[in-house]
Structure formats: C-alpha cells, structure tokens
C-alpha cells in the first residue's frame, strides 16, 4: 500500500496580529492506515481587535477525513480570535478517532459514523465514557454526464434505461468493478472516476456499492482524481462520443444540479436529505448519507468546550457556516 505524503509550510507574520504557522505532515501509518497531521500553532506578538483570552490550552483532534477539512478551517478561525489556544488536527479515519477518544488519548475524536451506543454517555450504559456531539450531516451525490446540454439522471434498484436517464446500481457496480473502471452499458461506454486520496466520501460510496476494501476504501480500478473538486471536474468534462462519465462527490461540491442523479426519484439536495437517505438505502447496500460527530472522553470543558460551541454556532462566519463552505450540511 502506498503512503501519500504531503508537506506544506505556510507562515504569515504581522507586528499587530497573531502569527499562524500551519505545518501539514503525512505520517506513515500503523496497520495500513494513513494519518494526516496538521499542527496549527498560534504565537501572539500583540493584539488587534477583540481577542478572547478567557480560554487557553491545547486541543488534539483526530479522526474522520470527511470532517478533517472542516476541522482545519474551524481551528484556524477559532485561533484567530483565541490566541491562547493551539489546535492539532489529524486524520486517520472515524474508527481511529473514536478509539483514541475512548482511550482518552486525544481531546476530540472526529467521526462520520456513530460510535457504538454502549460507549456513549448520553445512552446511559454503565461504563460509557464518550460524550457525543452531533456536528452536521453529509450527503454523497452520484454524478453523471453524457455531454448533453440538458440532462436528468436517476439511479434505480434494478432498472437500466440510459435513453431515459436511468441506470441501475448493478450497472454502476459493474463499471466500478471493471479492471480500468470502464464498461459498456446499453451500447454506451461508461467511465468511472473515484478519489485518488483517502476520503470518507469514498468510504461511504464504497459501502453503498458493497465494494469496500480495507486498504483502498473503494475496491475499483476507476481513474483517481484528487478531492471532491477533482472528481467533479473529471466527470463534468466533455466526454467522448457515446461515453458517459460517472462519479461521486459531497453535495456541497455539486455546482450544477443537472449532473446530480436522483435516487429512486428523490433529488440529491439538502432540503430533501431524509427522503434521499431512505431512497439510497433502498437502492444500495447502505445509505449515501451520514451524520458527523465529535466525541470527547467525558463532558467537554474549557478550551475544548469553547471550540465545540464555536463549531455548533450558526452565527455568520462561524462553525455551521464553515461546514457548508467545505461541502457538508449544517444541522
């Protein structure tokens, strides 16, 4: 298994405001799991504007790669207003984040799935140690493109009629199972795209197709693209004659709804979240949606609680706004 490495050092300096140093390091993983670490350290040289010095300390967050982009942005914004707080944000996956929180080795475990109910304090089980905070929601959209100026797609449980904009999940799975992610459906060439990087979005899609692989997330030879944006750009690029592109992205990255496939007739929209969730579960092996969570060992307090409250805030420019900016769905 190839471990991806990313190193980025960005320094911004001002005599009047806090200096933010962001260091991104990809760490060789244990047990085949890649962990991306971002250390966001704030060093104050002076104060400008309304800075909150009432909370201080260090926060170590690890877990879901779906929540990771939000956590990085939220941490950066929070520290700009709270210069006495340093935040370390890591990936590693939901299971990793939950387990580390259970063992009290981190301050916040990030997850795009719920922990076992017997481990959650609010469920009332003896011996439970995790305090659960529901952060937001995620919806994964199947996207398709045949190059036509007007398109309408619908994923069904067992019927394929490409001429009518329909494709069955069985045919989608067949394409993703092909050695190169390309197969023929009703005399059309269907080319699949997936994520080249580790992604909770891909993990969700892989489970829905029942093509999940312990190392690669999605057990497919489909062409890999970097990030939601990379998959979106690849699928929406003009396809060759008699070719259809197919892929998947988080809802927030759908820039034109004509490419987003319905699920058994249910639209992939934030307003239609519940019905889309039910339909995707009926069509596939699991849902193409999930809630997003923060887990702490016991009830959060101090800087950890202040940061969580910032993430839950629907004030302009705060947590729930940031959540939508990175392609997720607010509470």
Language-model-derived ranges and their functions:
Residues 1-11:
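N-terminal leader/signal peptides at the extreme start of proteins
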Residues 13-107, 111-121, 126-331:
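Exported/periplasmic ABC-transporter solute-binding proteins
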């Amino acid at each position: 298994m190839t471990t991806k490495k990313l190193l980025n050092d960005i320094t911004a300096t001002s005599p009047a405001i806090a200096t933010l140093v962001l260091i991104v390091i990809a760490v060789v993983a244990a047990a085949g799991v890649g962990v991306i670490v971002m250390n966001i350290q704030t060093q104050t040289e002076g104060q400008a504007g309304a800075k909150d010095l009432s909370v201080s300390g260090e926060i170590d967050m690890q877990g879901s790669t779906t929540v990771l982009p939000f956590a990085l942005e939220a941490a950066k914004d929070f520290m700009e207003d709270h210069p006495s707080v340093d935040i370390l944000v890591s990936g590693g996956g939901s299971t990793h984040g939950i387990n580390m929180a259970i063992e009290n080795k981190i301050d916040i475990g990030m997850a795009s799935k719920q922990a076992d109910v017997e481990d959650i304090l609010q469920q009332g089980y003896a011996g439970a140690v995790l305090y659960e905070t529901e952060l937001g929601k995620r919806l994964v959209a199947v996207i398709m493109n045949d190059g036509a100026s007007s398109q309408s797609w619908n994923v069904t449980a067992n019927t394929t009629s490409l001429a009518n904009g329909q494709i069955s999940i069985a045919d989608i799975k067949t394409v993703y199972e092909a050695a190169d992610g390309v197969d023929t459906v009703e005399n059309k060439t269907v080319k699949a795209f997936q994520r080249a990087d580790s992604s909770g979005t891909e993990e969700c899609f892989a489970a829905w197709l029942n093509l999940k692989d312990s190392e690669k997330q999605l057990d497919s030879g489909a062409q890999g693209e970097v990030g939601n944006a990379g998959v979106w750009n690849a699928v929406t690029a003009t396809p060759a004659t008699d070719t259809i592109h197919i892929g998947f992205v988080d809802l927030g990255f759908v820039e034109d709804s004509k490419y987003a496939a319905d699920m058994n007739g249910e639209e992939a929209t934030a307003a239609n979240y519940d019905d889309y969730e039910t339909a995707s579960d009926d069509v596939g092996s699991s849902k193409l949606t999930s809630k997003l969570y923060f887990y702490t060992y016991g009830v959060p307090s101090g800087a950890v609680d202040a940061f969580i409250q910032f993430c839950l805030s629907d004030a302009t420019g705060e947590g729930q706004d940031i959540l939508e900016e990175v392609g997720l769905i607010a509470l």
